[in-house]
UniProtKB/Swiss-Prot annotation:
One of its GO terms (biological process) is histidyl-tRNA aminoacylation. It comes from the Bacteria. Pfam families: HGTP_anticodon, tRNA-synt_His. The lineage of its organism: Bacteria, Pseudomonadati, Pseudomonadota, Gammaproteobacteria, Pseudomonadales. It is an enzyme of class 6 (ligase). This is Histidine--tRNA ligase. One of its GO terms (cellular component) is cytoplasm. It catalyses: tRNA(His) + L-histidine + ATP = L-histidyl-tRNA(His) + AMP + diphosphate + H(+). GO terms for molecular function: ATP binding; histidine-tRNA ligase activity. It is found in: Cytoplasm. The gene is hisS. HAMAP family: His_tRNA_synth (MF_00127). Homodimer.
């Protein structure tokens, strides 16, 4: 196949064998968010480039290296969104839904785009579920976001595979004082830093803290600690968050090097990480961004949120074997009909069953075929039972119900009793 007819590198098709697990994950998250009182918002995937320069920061890796940016026919510079927070802030500002101190608890889902080197768990088109809360400034809402994700991990069966890391970045003023101290410390040891971190020291010094370079990590052991520069307000806020997590029984680790890769964060930052996915260990990350709305032209409005990577969490579910059996199986019952009269009867019968058992996944054979070929397709479908309707069954107004998994003999069930029978052996287990 020519290159022009293939998917772009790092932008993957999600095939029918994969989508049931995606839908299971997305459905679980959306139900949880509904239960906590969050409302969905949907934003465009393309925004003016200036939005991300103002929000993320012009000297971040995302803006400098990773954004998909192009000029449209009007000469406007547009960008495929690399993350969701900036677009969500733009939307609430544009529509005035946070004015007058209105509290908004929002969530969104969709693709994001970054021109990174594709590898396991990291793609150029990737999908996120994001949550943003506006006009609540206490540690209680920070705690709610973390408690909510903790509940999600329990629902998915992955709590033992993830770890919560916390830090506080303080206010912008406290961060500026710390940045000056860090720059002074590292500048005196410039020859011990790798080339990439020498560049970061000039453009975004705090990013040096999350380096993976061993020699730079060794230098940072004796570097000034951000916690020593925190303002009193941030310190009290952070203590309040930790007290609530302790009360909820959620274990956490304080990571003083956790700074996040976006300029707009302040006070609380957190990440859920796993050691099950190799280098791409962060599955959910977020924090507080109290100055972002004002930075983007709005009135002072507090904000806090997080985003979780769907690809990584789906991969984690697969790695841990946490794929529910009913998700792996896409069909419950497969009907085989032999002869035109049986096909006509099957159509009416199966539609009646669908009315009575709307959650039953019932597939009817299409394309006719011999008994052997239809039965082979029934087995390949993964269905628990095959329904058999031929001339004999048609004459007796019964249908054969044959187990395809495990033990059990075929039973002939009267048409008017079929729904009740399937409800007892399939729907109710």
């Amino acid at each position: 196949m020519s290159k022009s007819l293939q998917a772009i590198r790092g932008m993957n098709d999600i095939l029918p064998e994969q989508t049931p697990l995606w839908r299971h994950f997305e459905g679980t998250v959306s139900r949880l968010l509904d239960n906590y009182g969050y409302r969905q918002i949907r934003m465009p995937i393309v925004e003016f480039t200036e939005l991300f320069k103002r929000s993320i920061g012009e000297v971040t890796d995302i803006v400098e290296k990773e954004m998909y940016t192009f000029a449209d026919r009007n000469g406007d510079s547009l960008t495929l969104r690399p993350e969701g927070t900036a677009a969500c802030v733009r939307a609430v500002l544009e529509h005035g839904i946070t004015g007058g101190g209105q509290v908004q608890k929002l969530w969104y889902i969709g693709p994001m785009f970054r021109h990174e080197r594709p590898q396991k768990g990291r793609y150029r088109q990737f999908h996120q579920i994001g949550v943003e809360v506006f006009n609540l400034d206490g540690p209680d809402i920070d705690a709610e976001l973390i408690v909510m994700t903790w509940r999600l991990w329990g629902m998915l069966g992955i709590r033992n595979a993830v770890k919560l890391e916390l830090n506080s970045l303080g206010t912008s003023e406290a961060r500026a004082r710390y940045r000056d101290a860090l720059v002074e410390f590292l500048s005196a040891r410039l020859d011990q830093l790798d080339e990439d971190n020498q560049r970061r020291l000039k453009t975004n010094p705090l990013r040096v803290l999350d380096t993976k370079h061993p020699e730079t990590q060794a230098v940072l052991v004796d570097a000034p600690k951000l916690a020593d520069y925190l303002d009193d307000e941030s310190r009290v806020h952070f203590e309040g968050l930790k007290a609530r997590l302790d009360a909820a029984g959620i274990p956490y680790v304080i990571n003083p090097k956790l700074v996040r890769g976006l300029d707009y964060y302040s006070k609380t930052v957190f990440e859920w990480v796993t050691d099950q996915l190799g280098a791409q260990g962060t599955v959910c990350a977020g924090g507080r961004y109290d100055g972002l709305v004002e930075q983007m032209g709005g009135k002072p409005t507090t904000g806090v949120g997080f985003a979780m990577g769907i690809e990584r969490l789906v991969l984690l579910l697969e790695t841990l074997g946490q794929v529910p059996e009913e998700i792996a199986r896409q069909v419950d019952v497969y009907l085989c009909a032999f002869g035109e009269a049986a096909e006509l009867a099957a159509l009416a019968l199966t539609e009646k069953v669908r009315d009575q058992l709307p959650s039953l996944r019932l597939q009817v054979n299409a394309g006719a075929g011999s008994f052997k070929s239809q039965f082979k397709k029934a087995d390949k479908s993964g269905a628990l039972y095959a329904l058999i309707l031929g001339e004999e069954e048609l004459a007796a107004k019964v249908i054969g119900v044959k187990p395809l998994r495990g033990q059990g003999e075929q039973q002939n069930i009267a048409w008017d009793a079929l729904s009740e029978h399937l409800a007892s052996c399939v729907v109710q287990g």
